[in-house]
Amino acid sequence: MTKQRVCPVCGSTEFIYDPERGEIVCARCGYVIEENIVDMGPEWRAFDASQREKRSRTGAPESILLHDKGLSTDIGIDRSLTGLMREKMYRLRKWQSRLRVSDAAERNLAFALSELDRITAQLKLPKHVEEEAARLYREAVRKGLIRGRSIESVIAACVYAACRLLKVPRTLDEISDIARVEKKEIGRSYRFIARNLNLTPKKLFVKPTDYVNKFADELGLSEKVRRRAIEILEEAYKRGLTSGKSPAGLVAAALYIASLLEGEKRTQREVAEVARVTEVTVRNRYKELVEKLGIKVPVT
C-alpha cells in the first residue's frame, strides 16, 4: 500500500508541480516539498499531434512487422519545396527505398511482410496475431525452411499457425480464400513449419468451442443455442469424440443439434456453408454426436 504524500508544515495533501523550477510545492502554505526534479520529457513544446511529430527527433519503436525492424531512415515529403528541390528529393527517396532492400533476402522478407499485412488486414486479425506470424516467418527464414516453397504459402501457413497458437478462431479455408495459393499448398507448408519449429499439437490445439461464437454470429443464433452447443462439445471432448476431427465440422454439427433442441432450426446446408465444410461432414458428425451422447433430437 503506497503512502500518501503529506505536507510536513500544514498537513495538506494538495501540491503544485512547477516544471520551470523543477519543484513540488504545497498548494496551501507554499512549502517546497521537493526540488531539483529532472524533467525526462522533451525540451520542446507541442500543441497538437502534427507539431509533436514534426518536432520529435526520435523514430518509431522497433517493429517485427517491418523487414528492417524500422531502423532505417525515411526521407520525408515537404510540399512547400520548389520544383527543382522537389525533383531532387523525389530521386533521393527513390534511391533510399532501393537501399533499404539491398539484396534478394531483404526483398523477399519485405515482400513476405507486405503479404502478411494484406492477409491480416482482410481477415481483420488483431496486431498480436500479425506479430506472432511475423516472428514465425523470421524463424522459418533463419532455419532455412523457406527453400523450395513459395513465400505466399509459407506466410499464409504462419498466419494459420499464429491463429492456432493464440486461440483466434480462423479456419484454413478462410485463410486460403485470402492468400494467393491453394489450400493444399498452405496445409503442406503449415505441417512442415509446425514440425520444424517445434509447434507441438498441444500448443496448436484449438478447442472446438472457440469457434462457436464466430459461426453462431453468422447464423444469427441466440445465446441459448450457443450455450447448448458448448455443452455438447464439452461432453464430446470428455468422451474423446473430438480427437482427430476437424473443429469446424464438430462445431457445425453441435450448432445444428443445438438449433433443433432450442427451436431455432437451421438447415444442414446453412450450417455447412458457414463452417466451410460439406453437408456430408455435418451429417456424419451429427449422427456420431447424437448416438454417442444419447441426445434426443425432436422430429421436425
Curated annotation (Swiss-Prot):
Family matches, as Gene3D superfamilies: 1.10.472.170, Cyclin-like
Keyword set, alphabetical order: Metal-binding, Repeat, Transcription, Transcription regulation, Zinc, Zinc-finger
GO biological process: transcription preinitiation complex assembly
Record's keyword annotation contains Repeat: yes
Each Sequence repeat, start to end: 114-197, 210-291
A single cellular component GO annotation: transcription preinitiation complex
SUPFAM superfamilies: Cyclin-like, Zinc beta-ribbon
Protein's name in the database: Transcription initiation factor IIB
InterPro entries: Cyclin-like_dom, Cyclin-like_sf, TFIIB, TFIIB_arc, TFIIB_CS, TFIIB_cyclin, Znf_TFIIB
Zinc fingers (TFIIB-type) by residue: 3-34
GO MF term set: DNA-binding transcription factor activity; TBP-class protein binding; zinc ion binding
Pfam family, one: Zn_Ribbon_TF
Family: Belongs to the TFIIB family.
